[in-house]
């Protein structure tokens, strides 16, 4: 016989909040979840991501180890 009452309660409509706003409902072991970042406000998914690369990694490596580029 399996042990009873060893599994956590399952909430099929757990509410996910981000900055106090309901963003989605999911299945979880807690009735409410609070997240800081989700796909609706993450820069990668919203298209507002900026890549700041003042010096390329290869060029920095070559300069650091004194290698000549050809």
Swiss-Prot record:
Quote the subcellular location field of this record: Plastid, Chloroplast
**Keyword Mitochondrion (UniProt):** no
GO cellular component, as recorded: chloroplast; ribonucleoprotein complex; ribosome
Mind telling me which PROSITE patterns this protein's record contains?
Answer: RIBOSOMAL_L31 (PS01143)
Write down the Gene3D superfamilies for this protein, in alphabetical order. Ribosomal protein L31
Q: Name one GO biological process term.
A: translation
| One MF term in the entry's GO annotations | rRNA binding
Q: How does it assemble?
A: Part of the 50S ribosomal subunit.
Would you tell me the protein name for this molecule?
Answer: Large ribosomal subunit protein bL31c
**What is the species listed in this Swiss-Prot or TrEMBL entry?**
Emiliania huxleyi (Coccolithophore)
Question: Species lineage, top-down?
Answer: Eukaryota, Haptista, Haptophyta, Prymnesiophyceae, Isochrysidales
Q: What would be the name of the gene that encodes this protein?
A: rpl31
């Amino acid at each position: 016989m399996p042990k009873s009452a060893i599994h956590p309660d399952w909430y099929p409509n757990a509410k996910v909040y981000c900055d106090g706003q309901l963003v989605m409902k999911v299945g979880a072991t807690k009735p409410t979840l609070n997240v800081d970042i989700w796909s609706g406000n993450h820069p990668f998914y919203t298209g507002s991501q900026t890549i700041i690369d003042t010096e390329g990694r290869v060029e920095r490596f070559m300069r650091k180890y004194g290698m000549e580029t050809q």
